[in-house]
């Protein structure tokens, strides 16, 4: 507990304006410091993983912290989304905005040629939705619900009555549908190491062969990124890039973060416990009342 410094005499009138300007500048710097990048994270088809190249990493400006979404909505139907700051209730995606921003960078033009006109980066995108079987879809929903069963969050494929601050998971299609040319990408999510309000995440089920377990675990990873979880360097954890690992879950163990090599986690922490981190963010699932 620190002592309060002694009160100083009021500054002269001319100094008040200087001090006020200084306070405003400091406040703006504090706000700027609170703004962090959202790193798009990718998962590769049929369980194959790779570390994103520096050129594949996009950073999107967003202010945190936010309250965690209590509903994970798995959307199997065709879906239209627009680029912008994440707002799942309105179908607005920061990931799409980042992809569009990258595509809008002018390409080098050879002498004597005319540059191609750029498409409107604000245009919406239409995703095809789930093209697997109904049985496979029901298995995906059950699998995702089991992954998040320990936590106080609802997993559903029925449109929620209240769309405010849900995790919208667009399931289906391929990365090219979003404008991503790398066919190895299986999922995309916004990430900055903290909770993202009303996020939209993507799981390219067709690129993953509509394989139930792979789609399920990809959903788990991408949703967990929106709750602030980093990649974990543990083969049995949902957050891993490692393979082959068999069936994965959120593991109650302190592990190093990393993709193909161990590293510190986002924010500088040496380890991450994916199970306890989700418990911290969402809380435990309430016990069912006794009959």
What does each model-identified segment do?
Residues 32-48:
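Hydrophobic single-pass membrane-insertion segments
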Residues 77, 131-234, 244-247:
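Metzincin-family zinc-dependent endopeptidase catalytic domain
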Residues 12-29:
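N-terminal Sec-pathway targeting helices
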Residues 59-64, 77-163:
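Zn2+-dependent metallopeptidase catalytic core
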Residues 2-15:
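Juxtamembrane low-complexity tails/linkers enriched in Ser/Thr-Pro and polybasic
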Residues 54-72:
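Short amphipathic alpha-helices and their capping/turn segments at secondary-structure boundaries
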Residues 69-82, 168-169:
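Short hydrophobic beta-strand segments
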């Amino acid at each position: 507990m620190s002592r309060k410094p002694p009160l100083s005499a009021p500054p002269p009138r001319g100094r008040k304006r200087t001090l006020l300007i200084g306070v405003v500048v400091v406040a703006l710097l504090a706000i700027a410091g609170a703004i962090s990048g959202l790193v798009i994270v990718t998962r590769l088809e049929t369980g194959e993983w790779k570390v994103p190249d520096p050129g594949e990493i996009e950073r999107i400006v967003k202010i945190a912290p936010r309250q965690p979404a209590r509903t994970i909505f798995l959307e199997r139907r065709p879906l239209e989304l627009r680029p912008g700051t994440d707002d799942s209730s309105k179908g607005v995606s920061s990931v799409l905005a980042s992809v569009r921003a990258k595509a809008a960078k002018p390409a080098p033009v050879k002498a004597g040629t005319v540059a191609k006109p750029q498409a409107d980066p604000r245009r919406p995108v239409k995703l095809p939705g789930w093209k697997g079987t109904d049985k496979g879809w029901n298995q995906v929903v059950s699998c995702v619900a089991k992954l998040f069963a320990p936590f106080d969050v609802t997993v559903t494929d029925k449109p929620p009555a209240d769309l405010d601050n849900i995790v919208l998971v667009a399931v289906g299609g391929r990365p090219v549908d979003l404008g991503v040319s790398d066919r190895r990408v299986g999922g995309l999510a916004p990430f900055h190491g903290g909770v993202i309000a009303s996020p939209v995440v993507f799981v390219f089920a067709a690129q993953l062969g509509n394989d139930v377990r792979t789609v399920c675990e990809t959903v788990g990873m991408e949703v967990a990124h929106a709750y602030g979880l980093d990649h974990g360097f543990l083969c049995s954890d949902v957050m891993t890039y490692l393979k082959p690992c068999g069936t994965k879950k959120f593991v109650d163990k302190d592990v190093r973060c990393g993709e193909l090599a161990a590293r510190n986690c986002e924010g500088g922490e040496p380890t991450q416990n994916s199970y306890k981190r989700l418990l911290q963010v969402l809380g435990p699932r309430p016990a069912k009342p006794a009959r």
